[in-house]
Amino acid sequence: MKNLVKLSLIAMLTAATLPAMAAKSEPYTHQGTNAREMLVEQPIHWISVDQLKKELEGKAPMNISFDIDETVLFSSPCFYHGQQKYSPGKQDYLKNQDFWNEVNAGCDQYSIPKQIAVDLINMHQERGDQIYFITGRTAEDKDGVTPVLQKAFNIKNMHPVEFMGGRDRTTKYNKTPGIIEHKVTIHYGDSDDDILAAKEAGVRGIRLMRAANSTYQPMPTLGGYGEEVLINSSY
């Protein structure tokens, strides 16, 4: 009898404590996180400049291409200025040729070269690789971009920038023809279109991270197409 009473008391106490442990006093109002979630790392294929350099050792010189905006240059200041001037609060300025004319004519003198681009270009030039810049910008009569890039990155054998915006093409992505034309082996870029253009051209696409304060929104998903992503490449 005494044992039965003891078991009953234990059962009652256990039942009384369970709701207090399991139930929330109020439903959450924000997404939040927890200790386990904070420790979860996404399965991204990270790569460094040093790893690339070692991997390419002993290989013949090759042709390399780079996107420009948010890949080699932090050009958000130009785009912010353009938006305020041509279409405040809207993205219409990107379809305005006057904006592209202004950017290509010399606005990039206010863009900031990214350190990751300096490191990559130095590494490739030391190997004897040829550097090409392929952009989705629309061209105009005056090209003020090529000299800015040549000076910023000390390009030894500078090729004119390839402006792919508005060009006729048979490919899905506008940078694909430039990648194919120049027989590129590796294409670097920050956008989904860069990675997809590289895939379409059948070459290796490597993602650079976009700066957190970039005006180019929304942010792309790093490694979203299984591509390699350069560490510390947002600056």
From Swiss-Prot:
Keywords of the record: Hydrolase, Magnesium, Metal-binding, Periplasm, Signal
Gene Ontology CC: outer membrane-bounded periplasmic space
Cofactor note: Binds 1 Mg(2+) ion per subunit.
GO molecular function, one term: metal ion binding
Main location: periplasm
Cleavable signal peptide: 1-22
Broad EC category: hydrolase
UniProt EC number: 3.1.3.2
Active-site residues annotated for this sequence: D67 (nucleophile), D69 (proton donor)
Catalytic activity line of the entry: a phosphate monoester + H2O = an alcohol + phosphate
Residues that coordinate or bind Mg(2+): D67, D69, D190
Pfam family, one: Acid_phosphat_B
Compartments, as annotated in UniProt: Periplasm
Cofactor field: Mg(2+)
CDD domains listed in its UniProt record: HAD_CBAP (cd07499)
Residues involved in substrate binding: T135, G136, K175
Its job: Dephosphorylates several organic phosphate monoesters. Also has a phosphotransferase activity catalyzing the transfer of low-energy phosphate groups from organic phosphate monoesters to free hydroxyl groups of various organic compounds.
Record text on subunit structure and interactions: Homotetramer.
Family according to the record: Belongs to the class B bacterial acid phosphatase family.
Protein name: Class B acid phosphatase
Species of the source: Aggregatibacter actinomycetemcomitans serotype C (strain D11S-1)
UniProt lineage: Bacteria, Pseudomonadati, Pseudomonadota, Gammaproteobacteria, Pasteurellales
